[in-house]
């Protein structure tokens, strides 16, 4: 990774906090801010650029970024995103951390976002959208619950009105729709049910597929202490908010964040950037969406970024490259943060500008000042907006963070400054005198869910019963009786074990919400590694780990494992389902499996001492890409214009995601008869490394495998992946199976019989090459691959 220049667009406190955090990255060469404010001059390697952020400025911004070799652009405010700034830079080949104009409609149009929530079953308040004033009046007249009235467009954070009664509601819609209080932003309004409870701000970074969420924050919108007075852009925030318990956050991730990210992608406008979700936590503990924003919040950004342990620039680059899940995301889980905004006297109504600001140095440790409505004038920093500046502090406790933030406020001086004195007051509500006990579920682990899963999968597990094992689960392990399985000559019997996982194919399964096929993959990756040693799979154990157990997902996965066990003739005798809050991103899980088999000593493969030049290589067809090479496959799909839900170009009746999720073929029952008859000298399971690296594992060092690619029809999926990704042919041959899932090494005189046995078992078999003397050759040579695609 090379150092890059970064351009941040905006001039507020949010942008100051972003630049402050980005400047800590070793990968930041220089940071430009357009237009910036009075606080940037003290930061090293940071330059303010006098270019605005309106559509008329987009061309100048692109020219500047091109001239200064900018490697990443970060628009801060919402309006440029709604106006399509992302497309301008992308057309110039410059990556942008921020969504397209289509995706920005989630903030730019409240009617659009409410309809999106309805379509994707995302919990929110009951609502109706109106463009007709009289129809809106009639809806209010017929309503029996308290209402919230929202101008659909962007109204500088002030377009939400909460009337106390119907008369105020009538006045509100008249002001918005008739008198145009918010201009064209009020051409359409949303009238929705008033929700009661505690608000929570969730900042979620997403690459369109994966997402990570920053610690939950609470904002303070009202100008006065005790949440009184007029609405503002935000007078302070604190994080993590105590109401954001592990179990609540898992609900938010599962019911709100994941459906939103998935829904936006499936609807054709993926969220690439920061999705800021305003959530209301109702008295019964259910989170509901109040609104979406498509950028970092203000002042929440000033609050949560000091809690971020990871490199922000690295996170953003991974986001725009659609590989967010490759970055280690960490926060300071043992710290609290508080931000207090200092405003000009008279804000949010009329206020004076041009007053000199001074900040007494040095600031207390872990206390930071973020400028917003400031500018440099004649060598001095002066007020230039309503919300002028903010003090943020982090500490080991919330109480200490609040105190330190107010000490920071005391270091700020300008005429008629104003700030609230009760930031974080909701966190300090009088606590019950009786000590509240914590349960395992409060910590994010549901024992009941685990028990429900066991009951749900018992039937599937039982269906894998075979001689030697009863496939009962719920005990401390699995037992197997070798003699009942037919291995009566114990002294001549060896046990063989294999362990493997599925790799990043799991991410595609999670994106597509298809989980049973990767269960089959898990079994296949293990039992195929047993059969290449001549062994019969006898029993299987699986491991499934996630942050929060989704019973349906886990059950689908285990049912797939059971299907794989039945296909290979082994018993599913046990496993482990591990729920580990904080260890995995929302919706993510990992898995591993172990298979144990048996083989008579005379049947052990490979029989390298019996192999000679001239022995024949038989290729047994794969069912697709199987389970290897998915880091490359995902990169090809996710960095092009294709989506997993698009029709597959090589098979339009199926989606790309469904095609690549076709499970690994299991070759056990088809191969064992021939191996036990001594017809096969060796087998190579074609996994990571492709034909080039796997066949040599099954042959002696004095021989080389010579494979001719004209001997079978390479499936179109492999050609499409190679061509679309611009993958060098030598690389794809070392990564994917190219349509051959298993290779058998056979004496020439046995070829006809082996092909017959395999075809009778339903396999497609090709004679793909032979063994030759090694001499100076590599372990495997692929001929006639030049015109593959």
UniProtKB/Swiss-Prot annotation:
Residues 438-773 are annotated as: AIRS. Residues 114-321 form the ATP-grasp domain. Pathway: Purine metabolism; IMP biosynthesis via de novo pathway; 5-amino-1-(5-phospho-D-ribosyl)imidazole from N(2)-formyl-N(1)-(5-phospho-D-ribosyl)glycinamide: step 2/2; Purine metabolism; IMP biosynthesis via de novo pathway; N(1)-(5-phospho-D-ribosyl)glycinamide from 5-phospho-alpha-D-ribose 1-diphosphate: step 2/2. Mg(2+) binds at residues 291, 293. SUPFAM superfamilies: Glutathione synthetase ATP-binding domain-like, PreATP-grasp domain, PurM C-terminal domain-like, PurM N-terminal domain-like, Rudiment single hybrid motif. The keyword Transmembrane helix does not apply. PROSITE patterns: ATP_GRASP, GARS. One of its GO terms (cellular component) is cytosol. Catalyzes the second and fifth step in the 'de novo' purine biosynthesis pathway; contains phosphoribosylamine--glycine ligase (GARS) and phosphoribosylformylglycinamidine cyclo-ligase (AIRS) activities. This is Bifunctional purine biosynthetic protein PUR2,5.
């Amino acid at each position: 990774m090379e150092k890059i220049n970064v351009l941040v667009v905006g001039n507020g406190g949010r942008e100051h906090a972003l630049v402050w955090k980005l400047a800590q990255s070793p990968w930041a060469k220089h940071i430009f801010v357009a237009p910036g404010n009075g606080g940037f001059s003290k930061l090293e390697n940071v330059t303010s650029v006098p270019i605005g952020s309106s559509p008329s400025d987009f061309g100048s911004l692109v020219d500047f970024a091109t001239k200064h070799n900018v490697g990443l652009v970060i628009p801060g405010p919402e309006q440029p995103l709604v106006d399509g700034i992302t497309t301008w830079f992308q057309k110039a080949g410059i990556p942008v951390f921020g969504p397209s104009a289509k995706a920005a409609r989630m903030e730019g149009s409240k009617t659009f976002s409410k309809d999106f929530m309805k379509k994707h079953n995302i919990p929110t308040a009951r609502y109706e959208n109106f463009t007709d004033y009289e129809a809106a009046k009639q809806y209010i007249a017929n309503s029996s619950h308290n209402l919230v009235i929202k101008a659909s467009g962007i109204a500088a954070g002030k377009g939400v009105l909460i009337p106390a009664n119907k008369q105020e509601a009538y006045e509100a819609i008249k002001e918005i729709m008739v008198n145009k209080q918010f201009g064209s932003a009020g051409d359409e309004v949303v009238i929705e049910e008033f929700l009661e409870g505690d608000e929570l701000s969730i900042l979620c970074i997403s690459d369109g597929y994966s997402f990570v969420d920053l610690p939950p924050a609470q904002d303070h919108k009202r100008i006065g202490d005790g949440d009184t007075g007029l609405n503002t852009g935000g007078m302070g925030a604190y994080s993590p908010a105590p109401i954001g318990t592990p179990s609540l956050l898992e609900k938010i991730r599962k019911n709100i964040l994941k459906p939103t990210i998935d829904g936006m992608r499936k609807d054709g406008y993926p969220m690439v950037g920061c999705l800021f979700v305003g959530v209301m936590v109702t008295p019964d503990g259910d989170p509901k969406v109040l609104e979406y924003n498509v950028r970092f919040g203000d002042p929440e950004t000033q609050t949560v970024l000091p809690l971020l342990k990871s490199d922000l620039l690295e996170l953003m680059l991974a986001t725009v490259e659609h590989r967010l899940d490759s970055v280690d995301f960490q926060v300071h889980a043992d710290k609290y943060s508080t931000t207090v905004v200092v405003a000009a006297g008279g804000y949010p109504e009329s206020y004076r500008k041009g007053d000199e600001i001074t900040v007494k140095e040095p600031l207390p440790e872990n206390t930071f000042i973020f400028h917003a409505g400031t500018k440099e004038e004649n060598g001095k920093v002066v007020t230039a907006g309503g919300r002028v500046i903010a003090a943020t502090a982090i500490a080991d406790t919330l109480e200490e963070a609040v105190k330190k933030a107010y000490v920071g406020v005391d270091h700020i001086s300008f005429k008629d400054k104003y700030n609230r004195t009760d930031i974080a007051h909701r966190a300090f509500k009088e606590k019950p005198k009786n000590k509240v006990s914590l349960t395992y579920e409060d910590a994010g682990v549901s024992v009941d869910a685990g028990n429900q899963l066991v009951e749900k999968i018992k039937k599937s597990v039982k269906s894998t019963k075979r001689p030697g094992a009863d496939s009962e689960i719920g005990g401390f392990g699995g037992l197997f009786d070798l003699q009942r399985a037919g291995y009566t000559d114990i002294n001549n019997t060896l046990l063989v074990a294999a362990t493997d996982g599925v790799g990043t194919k799991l991410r595609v399964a999670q994106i597509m919400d298809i989980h049973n096929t990767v269960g089959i993959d898990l079994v296949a990756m293990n039992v195929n590694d047993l059969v290449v040693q001549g062994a019969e799979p006898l029993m299987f154990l699986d491991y499934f780990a996630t942050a929060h157990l989704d019973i349906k997902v886990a059950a689908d996965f285990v049912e797939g494992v059971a299907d794989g066990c039945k296909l290979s003739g082994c018993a599913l005798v046990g496993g482990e389902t591990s729920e580990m809050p904080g260890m995995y991103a929302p919706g993510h899980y990992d898995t591993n499996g172990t298979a144990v088999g048996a083989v008579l000593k005379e049947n052990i493969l490979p029989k390298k001492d019996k192999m000679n030049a001239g022995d024949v290589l038989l290729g047994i067809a794969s069912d697709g890409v199987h389970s290897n090479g998915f880091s490359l496959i995902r990169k090809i799909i996710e960095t092009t214009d294709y989506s997993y839900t698009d029709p597959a170009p090589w098979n339009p009746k199926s989606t790309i995601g469904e095609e690549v999720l076709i499970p690994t073929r299991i070759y056990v029952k088809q191969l064992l008869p021939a191996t036990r008859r001594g017809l096969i000298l060796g087998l190579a399971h074609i996994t990571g490394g492709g034909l080039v690296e796997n066949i040599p594992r099954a042959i002696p060092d004095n021989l080389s495998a010579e494979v001719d690619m004209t001997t079978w029809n390479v499936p179109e999926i492999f050609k499409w992946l190679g061509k679309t990704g611009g993958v060098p042919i030598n690389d794809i041959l070392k990564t994917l199976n190219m349509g051959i899932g298993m290779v058998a090494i056979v004496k020439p005189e046995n070829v006809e019989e082996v092909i017959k046995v395999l075809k009778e078992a339903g396999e497609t078999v090709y004679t793909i090459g032979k063994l030759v003397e090694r001499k100076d050759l590599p372990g495997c040579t692929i001929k006639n691959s030049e015109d593959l695609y």
